[in-house]
């Protein structure tokens, strides 16, 4: 008997809700089994790296909010660290604690969206509704410090833009007290749910070797059982003073990646608690007048201060010639910024390393042999955002 099966080519996206952005995915299928998955990217390319070359170092910060727009402050953090490395400037301790505090709030902001939308893709609507309620509270904290719910533009080379408003630490403390029970509720719905496990266990497996070979990082790498976290291996700001664990998976499948993200939120809560308890008093920006604008009060009294403020925001400051690479443990993985300065007020080159770019490349090998419905599950656990992939 001859086998007369014929492969089908199927286009998914770029306007499909399950692709989490403008992903065009070309599937080569034998019946409903996937033989090849070919992702086409570039539909959200905005030339960010080139645009930054024509901006001062201060004007470049808002571009980082618009890369992975689900976790903006972590990307600002990477750029701020890179500029500080070239300037060799000291960041006040209070500013470092504020940065770490908001980086961990950003991690929760990212993971709640990922787990909620992943559950929705698989057919569970309740987790998304519950988690969006919690995300809204974090976005309010963003709004309190920066005036914006999403594109915060809050971190600065040398510190942060403004001090914490009165009462904000108490509000964050209340939030992290009531948040773990909400996570337990989500876990009670999903962890041992028969349908959830059938859709996630042994789907999209990436072995330790494959995860390393494809350049995975963050929960994608830790889900495969490799305990690599830049906050531990290459700590920045005050992460070396924080007590937390690095959760890892065993099998490298979709379920492990989901569970790693869930456990990471509990660790983020621990770090936020420590930041609130240890938060020192003091300055929130470096005292170098070349980097820090004068206060409003000084500008009302002194013409020189007014001129200084105007020059700082129009011309910016010169950064010594040199090159540096700084990376942070963003919620999706290692987000890195390579900066090359020729000594002027604008970067000669700014190369951005986005974790989602490497993760999307692995979609093909993780999808092979699975059903089409499983591809949607795998895309959800990759946690991709096209702002950072296409740049």
Swiss-Prot record:
EC number(s) given by UniProt? 7.1.1.-
GO MF annotations in UniProt? NAD binding; NADH:ubiquinone reductase (non-electrogenic) activity; quinone binding
* Enzyme category, top tier: translocase
Gene Ontology CC entries for this record: plasma membrane
**Keywords annotated in UniProt:** Cell inner membrane, Cell membrane, Membrane, NAD, Quinone, Translocase, Transport, Ubiquinone
Pfam families annotated for this entry? Answer: Complex1_49kDa
- Give the highest taxon in the source lineage: Bacteria
Name its cellular compartments.
Cell inner membrane
* Membrane topology according to the record: Peripheral membrane protein
Keyword hit for Nucleus: no
What is the catalytic activity of this protein? a quinone + NADH + 5 H(+)(in) = a quinol + NAD(+) + 4 H(+)(out)
Tell me if 4Fe-4S is a UniProt keyword of this record: no
Instruction: Give a short account of what the protein does.
Output: NDH-1 shuttles electrons from NADH, via FMN and iron-sulfur (Fe-S) centers, to quinones in the respiratory chain. The immediate electron acceptor for the enzyme in this species is believed to be ubiquinone. Couples the redox reaction to proton translocation (for every two electrons transferred, four hydrogen ions are translocated across the cytoplasmic membrane), and thus conserves the redox energy in a proton gradient.
Tell me the subunit arrangement: NDH-1 is composed of 14 different subunits. Subunits NuoB, C, D, E, F, and G constitute the peripheral sector of the complex.
Query: What family is it from?
Result: Belongs to the complex I 49 kDa subunit family.
What is the protein's name according to its record?
Answer: NADH-quinone oxidoreductase subunit D
